[in-house]
Amino acid sequence: MAKKNRLNTTQRKTLRQKEDEYIENLKTKIDEYDPKITKAKFFKDLPISDPTLKGLRESSFIKLTEIQADSIPVSLQGHDVLAAAKTGSGKTLAFLVPVIEKLYREKWTEFDGLGALIISPTRELAMQIYEVLTKIGSHTSFSAGLVIGGKDVKFELERISRINILIGTPGRILQHLDQAVGLNTSNLQMLVLDEADRCLDMGFKKTLDAIVSTLSPSRQTLLFSATQSQSVADLARLSLTDYKTVGTHDVMDGSVNKEASTPETLQQFYIEVPLADKLDILFSFIKSHLKCKMIVFLSSSKQVHFVYETFRKMQPGISLMHLHGRQKQRARTETLDKFNRAQQVCLFATDVVARGIDFPAVDWVVQVDCPEDVDTYIHRVGRCARYGKKGKSLIMLTPQEQEAFLKRLNARKIEPGKLNIKQSKKKSIKPQLQSLLFKDPELKYLGQKAFISYVRSIYVQKDKQVFKFDELPTEEFAYSLGLPGAPKIKMKGMKTIEQAKERKNAPRQLAFLSKANEDGEVIEDKSKQPRTKYDKMFERKNQTILSEHYLNITKAQAQEDEDDDFISVKRKDHEINEAELPALTLPTSRRAQKKALSKKASLASKGNASKLIFDDEGEAHPVYELEDEEEFHKRGDAEVQKTEFLTKESAVMADIDNIDKQVAKEKKQEKKRKRLEAMRREMEAAMEEEISGDEEEGKTVAYLGTGNLSDDMSDGDMSDSEGHLKKKARTVDYSHGHNPSNSVDDDIIEVEEPQTLEDLESLTAKLIQG
């Protein structure tokens, strides 16, 4: 085997100097690069390092897309970026390349901790980003980690302290920030939010705020999505004030022009379908497109499960798959891999795969249920027609949804064409569904759950002009699922759909008057008021009635007394002592005594307490005094005073809030420091135990010295097994003059190693005698 050449100190120093010069030249090129003057078309035209270029070239990334050419130079120069682009335009590379280049220019190592944090709203998108990063960063020395739900937390905790680039979902990242001792974000260089509008919405608001509060404020932030948010409040939460807006959308007057939200190669269609006929149309569509690769979006995981199981039993003639958020992570990953490899397949899915996932060669995207807004529509149809390829989309709209939702699409310059259904191609599957649900109780249960989940999804939608809950044909929809009737649904504060409609249409005043008595007064329900232990004590009943067991005992004693005397004296006559009269006022029982000593009862008898404060002159004043009206008006208008007071108090509360955040951050850091200290002590204790164990083992074995220090030291390097098991004849060389330098011709005594005390004594005697 060839010997590996090691560089000496001079060579290593020269290599470091060359690397420093290369990085400085790279920084100079980045500062001098102006994307307005020279717009790059290829990755090699950008000022990026050779290892990154090599990884891109090996992964077949040669030509830049529009979003990459616009955003990468700005990100390389260190600006915060708010980027919006079409779906399938290469946004992942647009933020991964700046992340790698930033850490490369900073000479980042595993000892520097976490350098970049990439947050994704879904597990599948996080996995896709991680795979792309490992491909293009294969020639760099950075460590990357993926943390998502469904994986082993302990396995991630053991390794997360050595990660340079961390990719994950918000919930799992926050969990590691709270629990991982070695995860330090104080030196973070870059924060990236993929599908930023989804990460910033109400679903992830608290989680994302908690993550951002632990990060360094000097970081660089990149936000990427196909539908971008420019809300000032959202951007302020991320400390994003001086940022650059780039992308394919033209920014005019602070608003994004959404003219090119969907790819130009995408053909968009819609059909008007009654709710009860949706499954018939879907099954007919699948039967007529057996040679295609399609994704069918439904609103809930229960619907996905029901449609998949029923269609699978009816065998439409194409491979069927299903994917939703309630599946295990392994099943979701396997389904994605199978769908990517297949060419003729139908995938039933929820919005868990609506964003960012790169599915190859998808022909059709079918939306059975209307999306909650236009942004969701854009992300759904973006699963096809990616990277300039052709694709088609179809959305099914009920007559109640059609007019309002098409207006919202037209407002975003999206105009889908209308398709008419051929009656010859339409096939009713209602009898088959009824037969399947009658034979299989599990399918019937799934159908009921699918019905309930769809109705609830309509009920909770915000856009009431599109989603009209009162006009839902529930009986017809239940019949179309194969159910005998509409199941009863419990809403928040409403037992059934009928009660919900009745309560919605009922007059409010009539409902208020129904609680009034004959005099027209509304009686409050005292049963809902809290009851104290004193209330419960005085509400006790039948306290004078004794138990049956006690009555039986007293009855037997009374019979014994009657047998002795006919008349018995209970008490002799006596005189009342006036000195004993005050004792009659004392409590007669412990309960009465406890009540007399109760602070609550005594305070109730005294009335409400009044707190006073004293001024400098010693006069008492109530804590809250009403100001004179004339003095109040002297200070100005009431609305102006109100605004000034709110502004002043808001500033005070903001300062207190910042202090509270700093205290919470310091407590969290102190908690981590204590964990690290405890781990260090455990490691030191383990090392001390090992050392003490080795010393004790060394004391149990005694060696006979040779008089030569070097020989003794070499003998001490033996392993424990050699010292205990090997029993060789030991040669002891002692000269007459006790000089080790004498010749070897002097007297030599060969003896075996002593085994017992007698052997040792005989050997000592021989040595003394010479």
Swiss-Prot record:
Residues 278-437 form the Helicase C-terminal domain. Residues 705-747 are annotated as: Disordered. A motif (Q motif) lies at residues 41-69. The modification Phosphoserine is found at residues 692, 710, 714, 743. Disulfide bonds: none annotated. GO terms for biological process: rRNA processing. ATP binds at residues 85-92. A motif (DEAD box) lies at residues 194-197. It catalyses: ATP + H2O = ADP + phosphate + H(+). Transmembrane segments: none annotated. Its main location: nucleus. It is found in: Nucleus, Nucleolus. SUPFAM superfamilies: P-loop containing nucleoside triphosphate hydrolases (SSF52540). Residues 72-246 form the Helicase ATP-binding domain. One of its GO terms (cellular component) is nucleolus. Belongs to the DEAD box helicase family. DDX10/DBP4 subfamily. The Q motif is unique to and characteristic of the DEAD box family of RNA helicases and controls ATP binding and hydrolysis. ATP-dependent RNA helicase required for ribosome biogenesis. Involved in the release of U14 snoRNA in pre-ribosomal complexes. Required for pre-rRNA cleavage at site A2. Interacts with the U3 and U14 snoRNAs. Associates with pre-ribosomal complexes. PANTHER family: RNA HELICASE. This is ATP-dependent RNA helicase DBP4. The lineage of its organism: Eukaryota, Fungi, Dikarya, Ascomycota, Saccharomycotina.
